[in-house]
Amino acid sequence: MDKFRVQGPTTLQGEVTISGAKNAALPILFAALLAEEPVEIQNVPKLKDVDTSMKLLSQLGAKVERNGSVHIDASQVNVFCAPYDLVKTMRASIWALGPLVARFGQGQVSLPGGCTIGARPVDLHITGLEQLGATIKLEEGYVKASVEGRLKGAHIVMDKVSVGATVTIMCAATLAEGTTIIENAAREPEIVDTANFLVTLGAKIAGQGTDRITIEGVERLGGGVYRVLPDRIETGTFLVAAAISRGKILCRNAQPDTLDAVLAKLRDAGADIEVGEDWISLDMHGKRPKAVNVRTAPHPAFPTDMQAQFTLLNLVAQGTGFITETVFENRFMHVPELSRMGARAEIESNTVICHGVETLSGAQVMATDLRASASLVLAGCIAEGTTIVDRIYHIDRGYERIEDKLRALGANIERVKGE
């Protein structure tokens, strides 16, 4: 397995170009199964999960090509089962189910894999499809969905806010007969992006970005060209990298209005932040950040995917900061690893209490999930001495060429090929 070797401390400064959002690209790739004509998807990040999704679409009979953009022609899809060997590495595969049953009347997906953070069941996807009229069976480790004729529009009230299930229901409802209303829908920018992609193909969707999405079913979806929005979590990660190293950064190809909660906390930490239409700059003017209190919650509140990075910020900040995680359980696996580097923190149920220290020292640490591992790499950039981050396949699932981008900012980081 590959590792990163990072030499610190360094001050990170310069420019970085933000990639397309993984969490929008994946649902959009699967939503392309609904289209009867070719689609072109631009600004798709080059990531392991994206490659897996493209492979899965090919196995279903879609023509998939990548030359800068991703081109998908799903007109000849003739296989309706997403097999275990691909699904086991990536839980996003569940998003194949809604489009398959909506367009072809049948679909089956092996139960998914992915990061191991707490309970992320597929129940909400299943109950949503059932409310649209699908029959669901769980057999031999597969979720099997079928419907006679078309799905039927329904008024669906989600038990809890779920990005994944909102995507599934919204995609399936585009081809259902009649109108579907999703109450307590997720409001994430990636949901809005997926909805806008579907609208490009001819879907009728209103209310995306609010907690009530209305979908008027149409008979078919055509083709189109669509550009995936910038990755707000990658943007936030690089902003934190500059903040903790007392540096300055310009993020290009960014979308500032998707990061309001994060930018507010960075300003509280003492960062000087400016934004333009598609850029964000941060300058610490050489100062150490101040500790901030953060509580994660569904969008538009502070994103759980930025929690590990802000935990690190607090651990090297002036003062004491509290970080409360309300979205996923078991999401503080980076804290013991950071403690090995000299961080001072206590975990009390779903809150981590961070006591800022002046410096961290390099150590051998292990990545446990995608965002936690990014925080370990950033810690290595500012720690005294050498840090080895093991199991970085987690990082490759969500960050495009993170080491190249960090190197361009002055980090001393190299990928060490594993056995």
Curated annotation (Swiss-Prot):
Summary of the function given for this chain in its UniProt record: Cell wall formation. Adds enolpyruvyl to UDP-N-acetylglucosamine.
Major location category of this protein: cytoplasm
Superkingdom field: Bacteria
Disulfide bond annotation, renumbered to this chain: none
Record's keyword terms, sorted: Cell cycle, Cell division, Cell shape, Cell wall biogenesis/degradation, Cytoplasm, Peptidoglycan synthesis, Pyruvate, Transferase
GO molecular function: UDP-N-acetylglucosamine 1-carboxyvinyltransferase activity
Enzyme Commission no: 2.5.1.7
Signal peptide: none
Name the record gives this protein: UDP-N-acetylglucosamine 1-carboxyvinyltransferase
Membrane spanning stretches: none
UniProt family annotation: Belongs to the EPSP synthase family. MurA subfamily.
InterPro entries listed in its UniProt record: Enolpyruvate_Tfrase_dom, Enolpyruvate_Tfrase_sf, MurA_subfamily, RNA3'P_cycl/enolpyr_Trfase_a/b, UDP_GlcNAc_COvinyl_MurA
Organism encoding this protein: Salmonella schwarzengrund (strain CVM19633)
Positions of post-translational 2-(S-cysteinyl)pyruvic acid O-phosphothioketal modification: C115
Gene from which this protein is expressed: murA
Binding-site positions, UDP-N-acetyl-alpha-D-glucosamine: R91, R120, P121, V122, D123, L124, K160, V161, S162, V163, D305, V327
SUPFAM superfamilies the record matches: EPT/RTPC-like (SSF55205)
Pfam families reported in the protein's UniProt record: EPSP_synthase
GO cellular component, as recorded: cytoplasm
UniProt keyword Transmembrane helix, yes or no: no
Localization, UniProt: Cytoplasm
Binding sites annotated in the UniProt record for phosphoenolpyruvate: K22, N23
